Amino acid sequence: MKRIDFTLYAITDRSFIKGMDIAEAVEIAIKNGVTVVQLREKDISSREFYEIALKVKEVTRKYNVPLIINDRVDIALAVDAEGVHVGPDDLPVGVVRRILGPDKIVGGSAYSVEEALKAEKEGADYIGAGSVFAQPVKPEAEVIGIEGVRKIKEAVNIPVVAIGGVNKTNAYEVILHSGVDGISAIAGIFDGDIEANTKDMLREIRRAFKERGK
């Protein structure tokens, strides 16, 4: 797997995207600093997901940004995405790794050190750790706080991105005190002014990285 810049990892949710299609929203986010894109669209048909993924892949290829597909290994293979991200209710990381082979990116969600270590052992390339804070997108998600994310980061030897309720107002504190490699955001990027959200969050992330000496 090539080295990935996880600084600002955008996850799509069409419920936040108004007046444009997902590919257009993704392009705005990338132009303003997003370094990884995860296509995460629930409650749509496989055909619709595939067609959206094709359009988004055109955009990510244009800017040489990795495209990760949430859960759907078949869609990832169909559009030649760079990888797949799986959560606790999806296929196990080890199974996804076996299907995709050694060259694709496989990410796993973790709410605890034990889950993170298991994902790493099964072949995950990175961990999505959280939920850092309560979040509107997944209100049922377990909140582990900045300290919980820090423990996960310290336990594994692969990159960790913090996810869950992180936005431009708290990204600085999350990066500074958890030691993670980047921030993953849904509403923090796509809810409202995508350009401003992305620029503001990237500025806060870089400010924290600078203070950390990264």
From Swiss-Prot:
Binding site for 2-[(2R,5Z)-2-carboxy-4-methylthiazol-5(2H)-ylidene]ethyl phosphate: G165
Keyword set, alphabetical order: Magnesium, Metal-binding, Thiamine biosynthesis, Transferase
Pfam families the UniProt entry points to: TMP-TENI
Domain of life the protein comes from: Bacteria
EC number: 2.5.1.3
GO MF terms held by the record: magnesium ion binding; thiamine-phosphate diphosphorylase activity
UniProt: 4-amino-2-methyl-5-(diphosphooxymethyl)pyrimidine binding residues: Q38, L39, R40, E41, K42, N70, S109, K138
Cofactor annotation comment: Binds 1 Mg(2+) ion per subunit.
Catalysed reactions, semicolon-separated: 2-[(2R,5Z)-2-carboxy-4-methylthiazol-5(2H)-ylidene]ethyl phosphate + 4-amino-2-methyl-5-(diphosphooxymethyl)pyrimidine + 2 H(+) = thiamine phosphate + CO2 + diphosphate; 2-(2-carboxy-4-methylthiazol-5-yl)ethyl phosphate + 4-amino-2-methyl-5-(diphosphooxymethyl)pyrimidine + 2 H(+) = thiamine phosphate + CO2 + diphosphate; 4-methyl-5-(2-phosphooxyethyl)-thiazole + 4-amino-2-methyl-5-(diphosphooxymethyl)pyrimidine + H(+) = thiamine phosphate + diphosphate
Ligand binding (Mg(2+)): D71, D90
Function as written in the Swiss-Prot or TrEMBL entry: Condenses 4-methyl-5-(beta-hydroxyethyl)thiazole monophosphate (THZ-P) and 2-methyl-4-amino-5-hydroxymethyl pyrimidine pyrophosphate (HMP-PP) to form thiamine monophosphate (TMP).
HAMAP family in the cross-refs: TMP_synthase
Recorded family membership: Belongs to the thiamine-phosphate synthase family.
Protein known as: Thiamine-phosphate synthase
Organism of this sequence: Caldanaerobacter subterraneus subsp. tengcongensis (strain DSM 15242 / JCM 11007 / NBRC 100824 / MB4)
